[in-house]
């Protein structure tokens, strides 16, 4: 699966524009005063301004598989990295996933992850910078607890998605997709790892390719 565009909402549009352009040094365009488009390698991330809520999301950005330590050093000069109590480190070592990650908050409270996946052939030799943000790699999806299993079955059937082969299904956590792109799915109010921040259901549209077809996933679903 490849995530092409991630459309999100924010109550802090100008602050995010400054953060992603000046702090993370990513290309940011503002097609109008209510929207920004952030170029993340092969993906686009679009924030549209909202005044009715303060949405927040979880997403991960893929980096070269040999650059997690450099990415940590680069980021630590720009943001406060989140500490993982279970690893006693600010680098999470997901042994079963063959991956390592670092996490931080952006100014809107989004939980941002940089992930290096060792089973992808994408090593890089140049010094780490935001030019090595390769794509949006994970998107967190949230469903109501009472519809959790039903909604996952709907995703599997409608978009030809399958369970990530490195993550057995758990009652409160699922991963659909592959190393190139994942939906990480939790029930509403479950804390986003590695924080104590409960997940919420906020509007999003994900444009992605899977098994040779292109899809648009809009959440929450419209009746």
What are these regions (language model features)?
Residues 1-3, 9-29, 39-87, 105-223:
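Glyoxalase I/VOC metalloenzyme domain signal
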Residues 31-35:
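Long, internal scaffold/assembly segments composed of regular secondary structure
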Residues 89-92:
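Surface-exposed loop and turn segments in beta-propeller and other repeat-based domains
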Residues 96-99:
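Short, small/polar residue-rich loop motifs at catalytic or cofactor-binding pockets
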Residues 101-103:
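Short hydrophobic/aromatic beta-strand element in the GNAT-like acyltransferase core
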């Amino acid at each position: 699966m490849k995530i092409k565009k991630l459309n999100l909402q924010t109550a802090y549009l100008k602050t995010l524009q400054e953060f992603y352009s000046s702090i993370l040094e990513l290309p940011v365009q503002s097609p109008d005063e209510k929207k920004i488009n952030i170029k993340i390698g092969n993906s686009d991330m679009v924030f549209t301004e909202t005044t009715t809520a303060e949405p927040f999301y979880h997403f991960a950005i893929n980096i070269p598989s040999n650059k997690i330590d450099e990415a940590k050093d680069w980021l630590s000069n720009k943001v406060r990295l989140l500490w993982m109590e279970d690893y006693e480190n600010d680098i999470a070592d997901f042994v079963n996933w063959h991956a390592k990650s670092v996490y931080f908050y952006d100014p809107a409270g989004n939980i941002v992850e940089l992930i290096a996946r060792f089973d992808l052939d994408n090593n890089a030799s140049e010094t780490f910078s935001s030019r090595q943000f390769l794509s949006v790699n994970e998107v967190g999806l949230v469903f109501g607890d009472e519809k959790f299993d039903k909604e996952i079955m709907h995703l599997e059937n409608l978009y030809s998605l399958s369970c990530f082969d490195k993550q057995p299904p758990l009652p409160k956590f699922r991963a659909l997709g592959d190393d190139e792109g994942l939906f990480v799915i939790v029930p509403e109010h479950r804390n986003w790892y590695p924080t104590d921040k409960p997940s919420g259901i906020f509007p999003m549209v994900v444009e992605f390719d899977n098994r040779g077809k292109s899809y648009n996933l809009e959440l929450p679903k419209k009746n």
